[in-house]
Amino acid sequence: MENKYEIILYGGTGFTGQLCAKYFSENYPELNWAIAGRNKKKLDEIKEKFNLKVDTLVADGDNLEALRVLAGQTKVILSTAGPFARYSDLMVQACVEQGTHYTDITGENH
């Protein structure tokens, strides 16, 4: 099955997520990506703030099934949603199950 997106940026409403969203939009205009997180209203605000021409996707970091659906739509999940000790395990599990590459920005050492 072909993925709908090349990258989904999960946690795009936070400080680092916004930097990533802005960077993608300014430097990779042909990239097929989406912005995702827990709050549709906040995602739409970021989309408007940076004039992003991308889809917004909602998935709660505590909901494995929602994360599976999210991971199943892309080649790569880039997560900027922390704390990673709380939110990364289920996302990693969803990515493994869907055959999706995963990366995050954690500096946490636990």
Each predicted region: which residue ranges?
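Structural motif
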Residues: E6, K75-V76, H101
